[in-house]
């Protein structure tokens, strides 16, 4: 069903329901360590992935998109999925963290890769990733359109501790959200 002009204008002024989930002091292994899974009937738009490592580690970090969910691994304690507006419904996307790496699903592609945690003149700088998707003219967010689609954070080497957050929006999937004008 097409949205009314009022619904379109409200979205422009109020925005979409936005959520944030944190992970802190995660003793992360090498491999797939954090995932955000899509939800049935929802469009999940990943807006920000922030990762901070306070300890000195040479750890390549990758953000990848998968068409199927991960399997196995040892789950850790995921942070609560918090709506940024208390009037928003509970989040439908699912965050998972792993203390033993999960087996990745079917890779669609890599959207970020960098050897970010570096030592400079034998003094650790305390590096971080703050990757924002959908910023700029015409740019899209990292979008999960099915319950099977997953965004994952992959480490090339173990990291202890690993801290950060993922921020995303959720909206019902519709064939064409353009109003009939």
Residue ranges: model-predicted function:
Residues 3-45, 52-83, 138-181:
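C-terminal interaction-tip segments
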Residues 88-141:
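Extended, solvent-exposed segments with strong compositional bias
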